[in-house]
A protein has these predicted regions:
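Charged low-complexity interaction tracts in eukaryotic proteins
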Residues: 607-632
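Conserved ASCE P-loop ATPase motor domains encompassing nucleic-acid-directed helicases/translocases
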Residues: 1-138
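Glycine-rich phosphate-binding loop of nucleotide-binding enzymes
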Residues: 149-249, 532
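Conserved ATP-driven motor cores of ASCE-family P-loop NTPases powering translocation/secretion/packaging/pilus
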Residues: 237, 456-457, 462-549
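P-loop NTPase motor domains
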Residues: 199, 203-206, 210-211, 215-221, ...
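P-loop NTP-binding catalytic core
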Residues: 111-172, 556
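Conserved nucleotide-binding/hydrolysis micro-motifs of P-loop NTPases
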Residues: 30, 62-64, 105-106, 214-218, ...
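Conserved P-loop NTPase motor module
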Residues: 528-598, 602, 624-651
Length: 651
């Protein structure tokens, strides 16, 4: 117990009584107490033989004098503020604070806070007040540092319980704040570093999948950033090395030309861990509803899509109307040929339907499906080339960044839907490669809004929020307006972080439980400050976290500018050089010869997917052999018949 002199005493009046969850106390004018300060009350009378101790956090402050009316002060100074300095005595002023109870010891019986001495909480008191002592025990330590609490000279690292952050007891995290000032992205980067450092080995392995949805925010996580000594001290206090992420893999689709990867991380010096993200018909068809307009595609069209998915794709398909010819559909190009044969056969027989599917429905579905590769060019290929995340081979403490910042909304939705669904499927089978996955989604109020149509992506995020913790799939979401996020997504987040908040957002009903002084502090937080809500904390706590030791997006964009647009040959060579730096333009030109551009792209994609030991040999083996005609003796042609001797137009 702290033996220091008390800084105040609990006080209660009939108008302001103390309760089991709230109490009031007064302090001296020089007391280091402010909004968010944690204090301890020592009761004067033992309860069941134990001196009660009550811990609380300050949520409101008041200042009083003995004035009955402001008019009395004006009259005493004759209306001149300067005369107040010459008053024979100073007016008595007191500071009165209101604190919300964090914890009672003993917890039973639960009684109103007694009239005891108030002490500033020390480091041990902070741990007890926030119930961190229960999960910071040696041998069963599950604490993940979130930041440092500082107030009145007390400094204490604040820990979250891994069982309530990554499951299975509770899970998910959301961070809210205004753009640019709330440091939402930095907070998530810091949390991932902290998790990778402190997540107990006994709990299994953990990885992160992050969607970069705007600018270069997450494009340089493996590059060191500049931090000052204050940030280094905070890193040391939390036991997290000030280093960038050691294992990061980047994925992005190609641009529409199918040659250059569509990412802001295109500098040649950073290409060793950048891989293309491309899918074919098999990978996309399961998520066709993401790209189809529900107002346009009815139940009949859905039935035909299900038929194609279950009976046609990746199967030997025969039909009497098609002459029992075998169709094997594995790509969008082969799907288009299948549709063409079906429609031609139906037209020849003058039928209006085929296998209960009307011709109009077949044409509609054909138009909707076969243009997916055009709408999502660069991501979806006609030929069916696949380059994907390493599902089944995820590595521990690795960050997988999927850059979708430069993509259209349709392509973004398709990527979200497929990757999250695949993560869930593999975690259910326990064959992903890791036990836990942190899924970071920025702009959560866009992808899981509280109003608007019930999209596939929103339903998927709702499912993750409600059932993901049992699988080890944990959602980390960032948004500017928490009030606009779907209630079931926000409500299922066990931990909530708040940076600087907008006054309009604070005026919404979701923040009505906060005291006015706490709202005022939220609206003026500095960068690096957060308000934290966690299942073990009965009241919000203010902490400061360090700037992550990774390069910020805008700094990386300046230091590693995007690669300039280059010729087709140069783009192919630049990609292949990430596997074999010894490749030359002369070799590539000789290998390409007179090959078609589509064939070269196909060979390049296969090489990047397989990553062979001998890149030269493998790439050349993927190119189609060029058959040249043999040079034989030239046949003599039929002689031209000569014209009349006296032809006036002859030569």
């Amino acid at each position: 117990m702290n033996d220091a002199a008390p800084l105040g005493r609990v006080v209660a009046t009939e108008r302001k009584p103390n309760t089991p969850h709230e109490f009031h106390f007064w302090t001296g004018l020089d007391s280091p107490v402010g909004i968010g300060t944690i204090v301890r009350v020592d009761g004067p009378v033992p309860v069941n033989g134990v001196i009660p101790r009550i811990y609380g956090t300050v949520i409101e402050g008041f200042s009083y004098t003995d004035l009955q009316s402001p008019l009395h002060d004006v009259m005493s100074a004759d209306g001149d503020p300067g005369n107040a300095r010459r008053a024979p005595t100073d007016r008595t002023e007191i500071r009165l604070y209101t604190a919300a109870v964090l914890r009672h010891i003993p917890e039973d019986p639960l009684q109103p806070v007694p009239m005891g001495e108030v002490h500033l909480a020390d480091e041990n008191d902070v741990a007890v007040a926030l119930r961190m002592d229960g999960y910071l025990k040696e041998g069963s330590r599950t604490g993940i540092p979130i930041g440092v609490y500082r107030s009145g000279g007390t400094e204490a690292a604040i820990y979250l319980d891994a069982d309530f952050l990554l499951g299975p007891e509770a899970a998910h995290l959301t961070i809210t704040g205004v753009s640019g000032l709330a440091t939402k992205t930095s907070a998530v980067e810091w949390m991932l570093s902290s998790i990778f450092t402190h997540f107990p080995a006994s709990k299994g392995s953990v990885a992160a999948v992050c969607f970069n949805v705007k600018g270069p925010d997450l494009c340089f996580l493996d590059q060191p950033g500049e931090i000052d000594e204050t940030d280094r001290a905070l890193h040391a206090r939390c036991g997290v090395p000030p280093l960038p992420f050691q294992n990061v893999q980047y994925y992005a689709p190609y641009k529409s030309d199918g040659v250059s990867i569509n990412t802001l991380r295109s500098n040649e010096a950073l290409q060793d861990n950048v891989a293309p993200l491309t899918w074919g018909l098999r990978e996309v068809l399961q998520y066709a509803e993401v790209l189809l307009n529900k107002d346009d595609v009815d139940a009949k069209a859905d039935a035909l899509i299900d038929f194609i998915r279950e009976r046609v794709v990746d199967r030997e398909f025969r039909d009497e109307l098609l002459g029992n010819r075998v169709h094997i559909v594995r790509s969008f190009a082969e799907l288009e040929a299948w549709f063409k044969d079906v429609l031609q056969a139906v037209e020849k027989t003058n039928k209006e339907s085929w296998r209960t599917h009307h011709v109009a429905t077949i044409r509609k579905v054909r138009n909707r499906l076969t243009n997916i590769s055009t709408r999502c060019a660069g991501l979806v290929t006609d030929e069916g080339n696949v380059s994907d995340l390493p599902f089944g081979n995820f590595a521990d403490r690795t960050v997988y960044v999927v850059d979708v910042a430069s993509l259209e909304e349709d392509a973004q939705d398709l990527i979200f839907a497929r990757i999250v669904t695949k993560l869930r499927e593999h975690l259910e089978k326990r064959d992903l490669g890791v036990n836990h996955v942190v899924l970071f989604v920025d702009e959560l109020n866009k992808y899981a809004p509280g109003d608007g149509p019930d999209t596939y992506v929103r339903k998927m995020l709702l499912d993750v929020a409600e059932r993901g913790r049992y699988l080890g799939l944990v959602l980390f979401g960032a948004q500017q307006f928490r009030s606009q996020v779907h209630r079931r997504v926000a409500g299922n987040s066990g931990t909530a972080l708040y940076g600087r908040m907008d006054a309009d957002e604070l005026a919404t009903p979701g923040y009505s439980i906060l005291a006015p002084a706490v709202k005022t502090k939220l609206a003026s937080l500095d960068k690096g400050q957060l308000m934290v809500r966690h299942p073990h904390f009965t009241q919000p706590i203010f902490v400061r976290f360090p700037r992550p030791a990774v390069m910020r997006g805008r700094d990386g964009a300046e230091q590693f500018p995007q690669a300039l647009e280059v010729s087709f040959e140069s783009a192919v060579l630049r990609t292949l050089r990430t596997l074999d730096p010894s490749l030359t333009m002369t070799w590539l030109q000789d290998a390409m010869g007179i090959q078609e551009q589509e064939d070269i792209v196909r060979a390049r994609n296969a090489t990047m997917r397989e990553r062979p030991a001998d890149v030269r040999k493998y790439f050349q083996a993927q190119l189609r052999p060029i058959v040249t005609a043999s040079a034989g003796p030239r046949s003599s042609g039929t002689p031209v018949r000569s014209g009349p001797v006296n032809d006036p137009y002859g030569f």
